[in-house]
Amino acid sequence: MESTISLKVNKGKGKGSKGASSSDDKSKFDVVKEWTNWSLKKAKVVTHYGFIPLVIFVGMNSDPKPHLFQLLSPV
């Protein structure tokens, strides 16, 4: 049994490196897109769980110092 190897040939106009460049650009774009989505998801979680502790921390360090109940009450 003979094994054959098939290679794809770029039949488009222009230089062959142009096709490789566009695929590299697409893969770079995909990597940037994945990193952006990942970082935005992490930022959303940090904001979600960190907002209330941040408000309490800033409120406790303000002058005059309020009680914890006053910080947590909506009024």
Curated annotation (Swiss-Prot):
InterPro entries xref list: Tom7
Region (Disordered) residue spans: 1-28
Topology class, membrane: Single-pass membrane protein
Sequence positions bearing N-acetylmethionine: M1
Domain of life of the source: Eukaryota
Tissue expression as described in the entry: Expressed in roots, flowers, young cotyledons and leaves.
Regions of this protein lying in the Cytoplasmic compartment: 1-46
Compartments it resides in: Mitochondrion outer membrane
Gene Ontology annotations of biological process type: protein import into mitochondrial matrix
CC terms in the record's Gene Ontology section: mitochondrial outer membrane translocase complex
Membrane side Mitochondrial intermembrane: residue ranges: 65-75
UniProtKB keywords: Acetylation, Membrane, Mitochondrion, Mitochondrion outer membrane, Protein transport, Transmembrane, Transmembrane helix, Transport
Parts of the chain that traverse the membrane: 47-64
This protein's record includes keyword Ribonucleoprotein: no
Keyword Mitochondrion annotated: yes
The protein's role, per its UniProt record: Seems to act as a modulator of the dynamics of the mitochondrial protein transport machinery. Seems to promote the dissociation of subunits of the outer membrane translocase.
Quaternary structure annotation from Swiss-Prot or TrEMBL: Forms part of the preprotein translocase complex of the outer mitochondrial membrane (TOM complex) which consists of at least 6 different proteins (TOM5, TOM6, TOM7, TOM20, TOM22/TOM9 and TOM40).
Family named by the database record: Belongs to the Tom7 family.
PANTHER family: MITOCHONDRIAL IMPORT RECEPTOR SUBUNIT TOM7
Name this protein carries in UniProt: Mitochondrial import receptor subunit TOM7-1
Natural source organism: Arabidopsis thaliana
Name of the coding gene: TOM7-1
